[in-house]
Regions:
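Active-site cavity-forming subdomains of large catalytic enzyme subunits
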Residues: 1-139, 143, 168-174, 220, ...
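Contiguous, well-ordered alpha-helical segments that form the cores/surfaces of helical PPI scaffolds
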Residues: 7, 130-131, 180-195
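Short, contiguous, pocket-lining structural segments
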Residues: 146, 181-185, 216
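A general alpha-helix detector
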Residues: 34, 67, 188-192, 208
Length: 243
């Protein structure tokens, strides 16, 4: 709903006024339920000032959404996050405390609470990330300790950050201490399929996808529970919350 959204969408396009461009800046947008309902219904949508919420312009929601999609097709960006959906899907103990996800990183794999929390403290989301190389699936899927080792490595990195964090990043340290968030993703799935001459959109590719991620999810959850038993739970937000 930002008044400058239309120009913002085009900042990476090499055409037009070069002084209004940022070709090397990666950007993203948040799409609300309100906007998507306007797109669905073919309604107009108000663009409002983020400062005082005054209406600065009214646009055709479908035309704006089409422009966004065409810009993604041409430039690969902006990234898109459906922020109302993200907040609906937050863990229940976060929702019960009134925590809110305001935004994410561009790739949108990190969706953690930010801003002022229920204890009156400011948070800056922190999450340690790593990727498993699916191209080498055959080398590690039978090793029962492999994913546990990666999860342990991520938690060690997070603890090292907490121990070393200077006062200037107190909000980030606080957030890391409250949740101890880590993320284990993948890369190389396309290379995995190519090595087996499996079409990307085939039923076989879908079957492998489900098999691989089921394996990773189960092992990662086992490792998380093991780490909790060894090192204790992350800081509990309050007595009503869950581990």
């Amino acid at each position: 709903s930002h008044p400058e959204i239309e120009e913002f969408l085009e900042i990476r396009k090499p055409s037009g006024d070069f002084n209004r461009k940022a070709l090397n800046l990666h950007h993203g947008v948040l799409l609300t339920d309100e906007f998507m309902e306007a797109v669905r219904n073919g309604d107009e949508f108000q663009l409002r000032s983020p400062k005082d919420q005054s209406v600065r312009a009214t646009v055709d929601a479908r035309a704006l959404f089409q422009k966004l999609v065409e810009t993604r097709l041409a430039t690969g960006e902006p990234y898109i996050v459906f922020n109302d959906t993200v907040n609906r899907m937050m863990p229940k103990h976060h929702r019960d405390l009134g925590l809110k996800v305001s935004t994410s990183n561009l790739c949108s794999e990190i969706t953690l609470p930010t801003g002022r929390d229920h204890l009156g403290n400011d948070r800056t989301a922190v999450c340690c990330l790593s990727s498993l190389n699916i191209e080498t699936w055959d080398e590690w899927n039978g090793d029962k300790d492999f994913i546990e080792d990666v999860m342990r490595f991520l938690d060690n990195v997070l603890q090292d950050y907490i121990d070393r964090a200077p006062p200037e990043v107190a909000r980030a340290k606080y957030s890391a201490e409250r949740e101890r968030s880590v993320g284990l993703g993948v890369m190389g799935f396309h290379s995995f399929l190519q090595a087996r001459t499996i079409p990307f959109e085939s039923a076989m590719a879908k079957s492998w996808n489900l098999r691989i991620f089921k394996h990773i999810s189960a092992r990662a959850q086992e490792a998380s529970m093991m780490l909790a038993q060894e090192r204790g739970l992350a800081v509990v937000p309050d007595v009503r919350s869950h581990a």
